[in-house]
């Protein structure tokens, strides 16, 4: 099969390693999703991700790479990008033909999808962990270990047949190994250097609480809103003292137009038991200073403020009235 050549072309972007990059526990992975509806219709999607941040996508209509950030090119020249896009177009054409030809032998029944995930994780400048996994219709199908194709138990006999074929393709295995253990780590470091200002950006979240009546009588749906934070990873939990409330439900992390994120976390509680609950937020921008908001705390502050301000206003009014009365009494 030729589909592994996609992985080679997608990461051979050129460029050198920047020596002053130091980044740990971050991964770069490439995704390919190829959908085969029948013998005459195929769609290929491609993307690249730096941890949870998408850096590239593939426009199958125009046959071009979409760079999603100003730094997504790394240190690659326009000529290198042009050459890579041409190679990708050729690859997808050959990939489609090759898979269709092998479909009968591998017992692939239309329609079907093939997903490929290749990447590397950087632990230090000297240590990386690489991987290449292939799925068929969303189930583990095969993987590459060192320079060999290894079938997944879920892939059954079809995966074994595919590996039997791939293991005879010495050039394909060499390409896969080279991409995982050489090109991927170098590309990862290049992106980290080119995008370090954006990747190292830290924006503190804003947090507020709200509630709404529940469909069940006597219950409240408490909501903890966390907005405007960056980067994306965050931990939010409703708490009672030091105890996490396991019924906490987290919604999807949604993007803002400025690149920051929003999250809503809810808890369904009996109204009388809402007192004493708090929402705790942990984020890299906060360092070790978690944000903790207590339910009902805002109301308590208002009551305290009213308890202080109202008597003060009454005292001022009383003083003014006394002065006014004294003034009238002094008039003959």
From Swiss-Prot:
Cellular component aspect of the GO annotation: endosome membrane; external side of plasma membrane; extracellular space
Principal localisation: membrane
SUPFAM superfamilies tied to this protein: Immunoglobulin, MHC antigen-recognition domain
Cystine crosslinks: 120-184, 224-279
Annotated SMART domains: IGc1
Swiss-Prot/TrEMBL keywords: Adaptive immunity, Cell membrane, Disulfide bond, Endosome, Glycoprotein, Immunity, Immunoglobulin domain, Membrane, Signal, Transmembrane, Transmembrane helix
Residues carrying a glycan: 25, 38, 75
Its membrane topology: Single-pass type I membrane protein
Residues in coiled coil: none
Superkingdom of source: Eukaryota
Topological domain spans for side Extracellular: 18-300
All residue ranges annotated as the Ig-like domain in the record: 205-292
Any one of the GO BP annotations: antigen processing and presentation, exogenous lipid antigen via MHC class Ib
Note: During protein synthesis and maturation, CD1 family members bind endogenous lipids that are replaced by lipid or glycolipid antigens when the proteins are internalized and pass through endosomes or lysosomes, before trafficking back to the cell surface.
Purpose of the protein: Antigen-presenting protein that binds self and non-self lipid and glycolipid antigens and presents them to T-cell receptors on natural killer T-cells.
Quaternary context: Heterodimer with B2M (beta-2-microglobulin).
Protein name, entry field: T-cell surface glycoprotein CD1c2
Species classification: Eukaryota, Metazoa, Chordata, Craniata, Vertebrata
Gene name, Swiss-Prot/TrEMBL: CD1C2
